[in-house]
Amino acid sequence: MKQVNGEKLLASLGDSVKDIRGRLTPDAPMDRVTWFRAGGLAELMFQPHDTDDLIDFLKILPDDVPLTVVGVGSNILVRDGGIPGVVLRLSAKGFGSVELAGENRILAGAICPDKHVAAMAMDNGIGGFHFYYGIPGGIGGAARMNAGANGAETCERVIEVHAVDRKGVKHVLTNDQMGYTYRHSAAADDLIFTHVLFEGYPEDRTKIRAEMDAVRAHRETVQPIREKTGGSTFKNPDGLSAWKLIDEAGCRGLVIGGAQMSSLHCNFMINMEQATGYDLEYLGEQVRREVFEKSGVKLEWEIKRLGGFMPGREVRPFQGVTTE
């Protein structure tokens, strides 16, 4: 992949962006955005002021310019060759709010941290959201991938998802239209989530606080929350735990370059010392190979890998064939 050239792309848009209120940043370092703190450059990063600004930008963006949405930067691994085209990063000012929206209902912006929704629910005696206190990331990503923890999932609370497509057209998707399954939704890939409407149920605030405290205490004990990590690396296979398969394959604490499978929770990959995107992805693929050779189970990535490789630093995905 060629190195990105954001100034050239920005210049090609010309006067069409003069009325855009958001921030356009050519050659934006993605290692400042992602929770892994690794990866190459975004050719052109756009941070819209609000939904209307986002729509205006999408309407003028040429169809042949790639568009990638990164949210708050969790659950993604950016490759060292960078991300071509436009990287959309929603701003906290326009998409980070959380507010009450009727009886037992909460409306949250796509990059509102999950734990802020949990806190809003607790403060107002709304049950069903305590599990969000233990999930890193933002609400848009949670709605997209049906994030869950402690036996609960996002799909249980979603009423509707507000989104904008690549053409700048607004959409409202009901829970049924989201087509939720385990760590997945059927929403079209080109939909950009802007806000999510949730509904809970009346609950005693003291009970909710106790549940949230338990979630936090457990997470601090078993997850590397103070490390540079993107969250769970692999999805749990049906009826199995990814961490257990990784542990049984001898990959707890496995190190490649500056990347490591956490010794605390071995389904968490961490940037322990200036890891590159190559280090992290190579480590993940090596773990997939080791697990398959030990158990016959082919782990699926939960973390999204974005962008292109540096020349000569490509990582071949494990295809499920044992070593000779």
Swiss-Prot record:
- Taxonomic superkingdom: Bacteria
Active site feature: 183, 232, 302
Record Gene3D superfamilies: 3.30.465.10, UDP-N-acetylenolpyruvoylglucosamine reductase, C-terminal domain, Uridine Diphospho-n-acetylenolpyruvylglucosamine Reductase, domain 2
The pathway it acts in is: Cell wall biogenesis; peptidoglycan biosynthesis
Q: Where in the cell is it found?
A: Cytoplasm
Give one GO term, molecular function aspect: UDP-N-acetylmuramate dehydrogenase activity
Please state every residue range assigned to the domain named FAD-binding PCMH-type.
36-217
User: Which InterPro entries does this chain map to?
Assistant: FAD-bd_PCMH, FAD-bd_PCMH-like_sf, FAD-bd_PCMH_sub1, FAD-bd_PCMH_sub2, MurB, MurB_C, MurB_C_sf, Oxid_FAD_bind_N
Task: Report the GO terms under cellular component.
Answer: cytosol
**What Gene Ontology terms for biological process does this UniProt record contain?**
cell division; cell wall organization; peptidoglycan biosynthetic process; regulation of cell shape
Q: Which cofactor does it need?
A: FAD
Q: Which UniProt keywords apply?
A: Cell cycle, Cell division, Cell shape, Cell wall biogenesis/degradation, Cytoplasm, FAD, Flavoprotein, NADP, Oxidoreductase, Peptidoglycan synthesis
Q: Pfam families in the record, alphabetically?
A: FAD_binding_4 (PF01565), MurB_C (PF02873)
EC code:
1.3.1.98
Query: Reaction catalysed?
Result: UDP-N-acetyl-alpha-D-muramate + NADP(+) = UDP-N-acetyl-3-O-(1-carboxyvinyl)-alpha-D-glucosamine + NADPH + H(+)
First-tier enzyme category under EC: oxidoreductase
What the entry lists under PANTHER family is as follows: UDP-N-ACETYLENOLPYRUVOYLGLUCOSAMINE REDUCTASE
* Family, similarity comment: Belongs to the MurB family.
Q: Main role? A: Cell wall formation.
The protein here is known as: UDP-N-acetylenolpyruvoylglucosamine reductase
Q: Which gene encodes it?
A: murB
